[in-house]
Structure formats: structure tokens, C-alpha cells
Amino acid sequence: EAVVYFAMDVSSSMGERDRQLAKTFFFWVVQGLRRQYLHIEPVFVAHTIEAWEFPESEFFQVTGSGGTVASTAFQKVLEISTQRFDPSRFNSYVFYASDGANFQNDRDAAAAALAEIGKFANYVGYVETAAEQQQPPLGTETAMLFEQLEAETGLAGRYALTTPESVWDAIRAFFARPMEEAA
């Protein structure tokens, strides 16, 4: 059995374009997983300075305001994992979408929570919504946290979502490797 956590930043810095890119990525990932696997438990988390779990029908409609504290999303994933999806019984996959903004004083807490996720997750993916002209892509603090996890575990990846077309490139990049290994 597998659980797939979809966590999304819905803070003020995530504009409509950013949210649409993230939601499109998540929507197609969910559809693809449902076609490929019989037993997938999707979990949907959205956050600003706090994090909440949502039913799928509400997750794709959620918007928020305020600042960004990424560690709250990671802590919510850890909480749900502990309460409902024992990592010894479930393969766990985590996908996080953000524009990369995060309160500076949250860096250590976000790094610690992400490291805890890295201890049990089969794979952790990060998509960063970015403008096409943003240089360098994936140059944010949040992207660097995922780069560090990727270097430490080899079971993480990052991808910049810049256009609707890049959603498919991200899906191919993430699923070429982890899903083959999990099968």
C-alpha cells in the first residue's frame, strides 16, 4: 500500500498563476497514480503560517493569505504519518509545491522536519513555481532544503514549473525513477 502526500503553499506570495501550476501538477499526478495503482491513499495539505489537511474536493479550490512557514506543512505530514500511515506498512511519497518563499526564521525548523520525512519517505519531490526568466531556477532557500535532502538520501528531486507545459516535464522527471523502483 502507498500513501502520497500533496502539500501546497497557498500563502499570499503564491499568485494565481503559481497556484494554478501547482494544482495542475497535483491533479495530473493524482490521476496518473489512480490509473496505475489499486491502493493509493492521497493526503492533501495546504499551508500558510499554519497547515491544514483538506479533502481532495476542497484542496483543489483552496486559497490563502498571509505569510509562509513551510515547516508547518512538513510537520502536518509527519503528524498524519504517525497517526494514520505507519511507514513500516505504507510506502510514502511526498510532493510539495511552493514559490520558494519562506520566513527566514523557519529555515531550521523546515530543514529538521524535512529531514524527518526523509527518514521514512520512499521519495520526496518539490516543484517550485517560477517565472520563466527567473535566474537561477530553483535558487530559493526552500529549493536548497530539497537539494540537501536529495544529496543526503538520493530519494528526492526538484523541478521548476514555469509554464503549463512544464507540468508534464516535471511529472516525467519525477516518475521515471521513483515509481519504477517502487513497483
Pin down the residues of each PLM region.
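Acidic, glycine-rich A-domain
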Residues: 1-183
